A protein has these predicted regions:
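N-terminal export/membrane-targeting signals
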Residues: 3-21
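Bacterial Sec-dependent N-terminal signal peptides
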Residues: 15-44
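Short acidic, Pro/Gly- and aromatic-enriched capping/linker segments at domain boundaries
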Residues: 43-56
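Extracellular glycoside hydrolase catalytic/binding regions
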Residues: 49, 74, 81, 86-102, ...
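Short polybasic amphipathic segments
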Residues: 55-59, 408
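A short, well-structured catalytic beta-strand-centered motif of the EAL phosphodiesterase domain
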Residues: 67-73
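Aromatic-lined substrate-binding rim segments of carbohydrate-active enzymes
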Residues: 90-192, 205-207, 254-264, 357-392
Length: 443
């Protein structure tokens, strides 16, 4: 009896073992093997912090860094009404509108990352900071010229709206850009009026903007990734006595820099020049003082002695390149001792159609949709020659739509050059250049 019981228990043991092990060609296989832990999802690559050493942007490993990207502005009109309009879907510059804007720019940043962009110039667009109340007048606009108009008019600026939309829009845009591998250069709301002088109302306006901005914890925590461009396109700037003075630029912007530093922001600050950001001669003798200082420059066709008409592409292109480099050095001597970023530049060739007069009263031939008219094989090669010669010039094209076809991106996620890939326009040229520069950056 005991023997039978033993055999029975033995058989039960075999049957039980067969429920966990399967024999296949003599190999015991566990039908419920332990699953290996899933591969961890890699964390997004963290941008190295940047600082200034001499005339270079430098990362923590001492590598010299040059950045390439675009500027853009969170504005329904300038974004082609792609994320809303007051007429079609009741979109306004409020918190609900901010969410739509953020969703739109998430798609834009995805495309810019694919286009090998490493920097984004963010405009704190006044559409958000201006108060919609018709009766509201910003007290700080006292002293503004009666004919101030457009984005040079600060009479509707509301500091409380700036603070609010820094929290709900602007800094969220900056964070999104950084998560897509781009450093962020922040420009103040609007543009400078035509005439400035040390101690004027507009200097105080900029002081207020940057005081509020540089107190933000997020900004100070990301001082190696977010930088400040102090003003957009000063034209004429005089001293406190309204006289020409080589120290006027320094005296206008140095107090603003000092306020930013007093608030604890240690990151890079980009100072502008006069002449719509084309003249930096006075900074050679009176530079902005302190650490992490660079200069923000603009470059368009016809500036710095270079245009399609002046370039001898067929007979002596090297001489044309040398002239561009010489004229740029003459106007922007700071490139010898500080990093420079060209925060506005674009070009496209003449295209049959109607031209127009720009805001300076200059006639502009019809082109593919850029501010200035020129071609890559003439003006463009001289522009790039200057970038490569200097070595310490970063750049942002004047808009996302100057680099990539935004509508195509939104349609199917593909990233193709703007203007149908026209080889003489900045979109195709810069997509090629950015890929080249990106490869060097990663190697």
């Amino acid at each position: 009896m005991k023997q039978r019981l033993f055999i029975f228990i033995f058989l039960i043991g075999i049957m039980t073992s067969c429920t966990t092990d399967v024999v296949d060609n003599g190999i015991i296989i566990d039908p419920n093997p332990e699953k290996p832990d899933p591969e961890p999802v890699p964390e997004p690559e963290i941008l190295p912090s940047l600082h200034v050493e001499g005339k270079w942007l430098v990362d923590p490993q001492g590598n010299q860094v040059v950045l390439h990207g675009v500027m853009d502005t969170p504005n329904m009109y300038f974004n082609g009404w792609r994320w809303g309009s007051p007429w079609t879907n009741n979109t306004n510059y409020n918190d609900a509108g901010a969410k739509k804007c953020l969703d739109y720019f998430e798609k834009i940043f995805t495309g810019l990352e694919k286009a090998k962009c490493t920097v984004f110039r963010l405009h704190l667009d006044p559409a958000w900071t201006n108060d919609p109340d018709n009766s509201y007048v910003y007290a700080g606009s006292a002293g503004q010229a009666a004919d101030a108009s457009g984005e040079a008019d600060i009479s509707k600026f509301n500091p409380e709206r700036l603070t609010h939309f820094l929290d709900t829009l602007y800094l969220n845009l900056a964070e999104k850009a950084m998560k897509h591998g781009m450093y962020v250069v922040v420009r103040p709301p609007g543009v400078c009026p035509g005439n400035l002088k040390v101690g004027d109302y507009y200097q105080q306006y900029l002081m207020t903007v940057w005081d509020i901005f540089s107190q933000q914890s997020f900004v100070k925590e990301h001082a190696g990734h977010i930088s400040i461009e102090l003003a957009n396109e000063p034209v004429n700037l005089k001293n406190a006595q309204n006289k020409e003075d080589t120290k006027a630029l320094h005296d206008y912007f140095q107090p603003i820099v000092d306020k930013i530093r007093a608030n604890g922001f240690t990151g890079i600050i980009w100072a502008p020049g006069t002449g719509w950001q084309s003249n930096y001669k006075s900074y050679k003798t009176h530079p902005i003082e302190g650490d992490n200082i660079g200069y923000a420059v603009h470059d368009y066709t016809g500036w710095y002695g270079c245009s399609d008409e002046s370039v001898d592409r067929d007979n002596n292109i090297e001489k044309s390149k040398e002239k561009k480099i010489k004229e740029f050095y003459n106007s922007v001597p700071v490139v010898d001792f500080a990093p420079v970023i060209i925060t506005e530049v674009d070009w496209s060739p003449v295209k049959p159609g109607e031209g127009h007069y720009n805001e300076h009263g200059d006639w502009v031939e019809s082109n593919y949709g850029t501010w200035s008219t020129g071609s890559t094989s003439k003006w463009g090669v001289c522009y790039k020659a200057n970038l490569d010669h200097c070595g310490n010039i970063s750049m942002t094209l004047s808009g996302t739509s100057c680099l990539i076809d935004v509508d195509q991106l939104l349609k199917d996620g593909s990233v193709v050059p703007a203007f149908g890939g026209e080889p003489e326009a900045c979109g195709k040229a810069c997509m090629d250049w950015y890929e080249e520069y990106y490869g060097k950056l990663k190697n």
